[in-house]
A protein has these predicted regions:
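Active-site-proximal cap/lid insertion segments
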Residues: 1-134, 144-158, 196-201, 210-216, ...
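Short, solvent-exposed loop/turn segments at the edges of secondary structure
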Residues: 95, 109-113, 134, 155, ...
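Short Gly/Pro-enriched turn/cap motifs at secondary-structure boundaries
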Residues: 104-109, 174-177, 182-183, 195
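Acidic/polar loop patches that form or flank catalytic/metal-binding clefts of enzymes
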Residues: 125-131, 148-158, 169-175, 243-246, ...
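Zinc-coordinating Cys/His ligand positions in small cysteine/histidine-rich zinc-finger domains
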Residues: 136, 140, 398
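C-terminal accessory region downstream of the catalytic core in glycan-modifying enzymes
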Residues: 144, 149, 160-171, 186-257, ...
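Extracellular/secretory pathway-exposed regions associated with glycan biology
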Residues: 246-327, 331-410
Length: 410
């Protein structure tokens, strides 16, 4: 009873497949002394449960269950909106967040940490549980992995197949959130949380969310290890996030710190790996086997193995000589992705027309890791990466500013 049906009429998306519209309540929840909104809420959750069961049974009936993966999750914790004029609702009515603090819109676990069920009879063992934090962007990489295609280089996610299948080694992913003045990051098994990040000097609260789900014990400042972790968290959030003009933050003007690496451990050069293949997007070359690798003095196409159906991955470190605004300019015949630290700096992939793309970052003096991905097109290959600083004219990045790890031989 109840349900929905497609009418194809504007404004008629709320209807009923059977019975009187806006009327059905699951009999398990009527006459129990709860509010009308609570009856609606419980009915909706139960309907979802039944529908998921229907989907799984249909998959089995079609005999495709051995070749199917189903993921069921949520985008946030319990909400406080009633969605009915004049009615009120509290996320605590059915204790939907369990022992967690917070709700939808909060960066506490009650707002962020949602249950996820993975079902795949031929791959995923039932009854297993993982407390490893992951984020929505990991699912695209995961589905690409299951489908046997290379994930796009532009995404932040990592495949969760090793965790789901209990095989291989799980790569570390990025779990980072910011909303209004809230900021959260998972690092080294701990969660850093700033509920009022009015400036970058504000310290993170630090929680062990596995043993302390309610986030009741702030570990920040309790010993030198957590003092060091505090410093790393403050540096890492600047290396991950990109300012957004539509959601300005008080820490947008902070300089991105370089890595704590001695230049003595580096040498001049660019690490280059070559790939052959036909891809619909710039793939994540770091998760693929390279045809060959070499060391070049600068970024060029000398190592390109073919003019068509080929790709290059340039990587290493850029030595930034002075703090301030640094603009990077990319132009290519083909497609490209440019990252510094874990930031997507330039996206020249989908619908890229070959014109110059520029992005400005606030970088501190020091050593910053980069990756430049290039995929050939049907035209003659070409690629250019330039930089520009307050006292550095626009031009190709000089060879003495491009570094790689250790002593390298060309």
């Amino acid at each position: 009873k109840g349900g929905l049906k497609w009418l194809g009429q504007a404004g008629k998306m709320i209807n009923t497949a059977e019975g009187t519209i806006d009327h059905y309540r699951d009999p398990n929840y009527t006459g129990k002394g709860i509010t009308d909104v609570a009856e609606r809420f419980a009915t909706s959750i139960t309907r979802i449960d039944h529908c998921v069961g229907d989907i799984l049974q249909t998959i089995k009936d079609l005999k495709i269950d051995k070749n199917t993966i189903v993921i069921f999750s949520s985008d946030n914790g319990p909400h406080r909106e009633a969605y009915i004029k004049g009615k009120r609702w509290s996320p605590s009515v059915f204790q939907s967040a369990g022992t967690f603090k917070g709700s939808k819109g909060s960066s506490y676990e009650g707002g962020l940490r949602v249950p996820t069920f993975a079902w795949g009879p031929s791959r995923i063992k039932s009854g297993k549980k993982s407390n490893s934090p992951s984020q929505f962007h990991d699912w695209m990489a995961t589905f690409c992995d299951y489908a046997g295609v290379n994930a796009p280089a532009r995404i932040d996610g990592v495949s969760l197949v090793p965790t789901l299948n209990r095989t291989g080694k799980q790569r570390k992913g990025i779990v980072y959130v910011e909303f209004n003045n809230q900021q959260g990051l998972y690092l080294d098994g701990y969660k850093g949380l700033r509920m009022k990040a009015t400036g970058h000097a504000v310290d993170f609260e630090i929680f062990n969310t596995i043993d302390d789900g309610p986030e009741s014990k702030n570990l920040a400042g309790t010993n030198e290890d957590f003092n060091r972790l505090q410093k790393r968290m403050k540096a890492e959030v600047l290396r991950i996030r990109m300012p957004n003009k539509h959601a300005k933050k008080s820490y947008d003007g902070e300089l991105v710190p370089g890595l704590d690496i001695s230049k003595k451990d580096l040498s001049n050069g660019v690490a280059v790996k070559t790939y052959l293949g036909e891809w619909d997007w710039v793939p994540e070359f770091t998760q693929m086997s390279a045809e060959a690798s070499s060391l070049e003095k600068n970024i060029n196409l000398k190592s390109l193995p073919a003019e068509k159906n080929a790709g290059l991955l340039f990587s290493g470190y850029i030595q930034i000589p002075e703090p301030g605004d640094w603009t990077f300019h990319c132009e290519a015949s083909g497609s490209l992705i440019f990252k510094i630290h874990n930031k997507l700096v330039i996206d020249g992939d989908y619908k890229y027309d070959g014109t110059e793309i520029s992005t400005t970052l606030k970088l501190d003096r020091g050593i910053h890791p980069y990756r430049l991905y290039y995929k050939t097109s049907a035209k003659k290959p070409s690629l250019s990466l330039q930089w520009e600083g307050s006292s550095v004219a626009k031009g190709l990045i000089p060879a003495d500013a491009l570094l790689v790890q250790g002593e390298q031989k060309r």
